[in-house]
């Protein structure tokens, strides 16, 4: 579920860059995790980057969003900022990496590190970077 607040305290100003900068850092963290072979953390950091980037768009548009599903966050954007179907499909893939990389009970046995592959982490990072690029156009004008 996504909770959107249409408006913000003008005295506070937009916090769009405050959300987007950590999104960029999370992508960097994802790349470093990929290089280190911690593929589950690379996937999680990629998901976090996309989530924060979309929340930055809400801020840039004078709103706020709560929730963790990148798919639902994208769907809640106003039509002018909403991406096409390809990015929504990538968001669906990223949403799978919100819980799984962190908790062993996401799998029938073993730890998350036993299930994540380099290819999967690379796909997550690529998906995240594409979503960040879309969001960047709405945040950094």
Describe each PLM feature range.
Residues 1-141:
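Terminal alpha-helical segments
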């Amino acid at each position: 579920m996504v909770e959107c607040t249409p408006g913000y305290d003008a005295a506070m100003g937009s916090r769009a860059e405050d959300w987007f900068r950590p999104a960029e850092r999370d992508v960097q963290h994802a790349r470093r995790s990929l290089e280190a072979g911690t593929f589950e953390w690379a996937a999680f950091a990629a998901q976090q980057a996309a989530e924060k980037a979309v929340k930055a768009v809400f801020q840039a548009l004078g709103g706020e969003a709560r929730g963790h599903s990148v798919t639902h966050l994208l769907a809640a954007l106003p039509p002018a900022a909403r991406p096409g179907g390809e990015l929504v499909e990538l968001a669906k893939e990223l949403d799978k990496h919100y819980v799984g990389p962190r908790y062993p009970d996401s799998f029938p046995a073993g730890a998350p590190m036993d299930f994540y592959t380099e290819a999967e982490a690379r796909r997550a990072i690529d998906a995240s970077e594409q979503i960040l690029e879309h969001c960047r156009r709405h945040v950094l004008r």
